[in-house]
């Protein structure tokens, strides 16, 4: 089974992805892990590699291509990333987590040690930048939810409730196999 989990920063994709991967003993691959792997391959620290990535579209394109390749050639895997649902066309279940910018900013502030105002401003700026890149590189409108099978509001449901919903969906799909 191939599962993708996408969502904006702070929506809970990592928490959900790791929980589902642990339950089913699936491999978990995040876009962040792919980014770190590319930095390591180039013998660069993350800060330096991140600076290059800001201005070099080839890095984004390579991260997305690697995630697509891993997802389409692997079984029993969870792929987590903003574009995972778009990139892994043969996924069995494509999940999108949503939450308001205010909710996500609160989570990011707590996780990153920022004020909520800082987190909110950073989040809005990052999302606008990403939306532009996704449209430019792939003609993907990040607000088009059509590729997704399951869209959940992580502001409405707790992490445990999200896990239970997705667990039920995965169990149902596994029974079909």
UniProtKB/Swiss-Prot annotation:
GO terms for biological process: pyrimidine nucleotide metabolic process. Its EC number is 2.7.4.25. It catalyses: CMP + ATP = CDP + ADP; dCMP + ATP = dCDP + ADP. It is an enzyme of class 2 (transferase). Gene3D superfamilies: P-loop containing nucleotide triphosphate hydrolases. InterPro entries: Cyt_kin_arch, Cytidylate_kinase_dom, P-loop_NTPase. One of its GO terms (cellular component) is cytoplasm. CDD domains: CMPK. Belongs to the cytidylate kinase family. Type 2 subfamily. This is Cytidylate kinase. The gene is cmk.
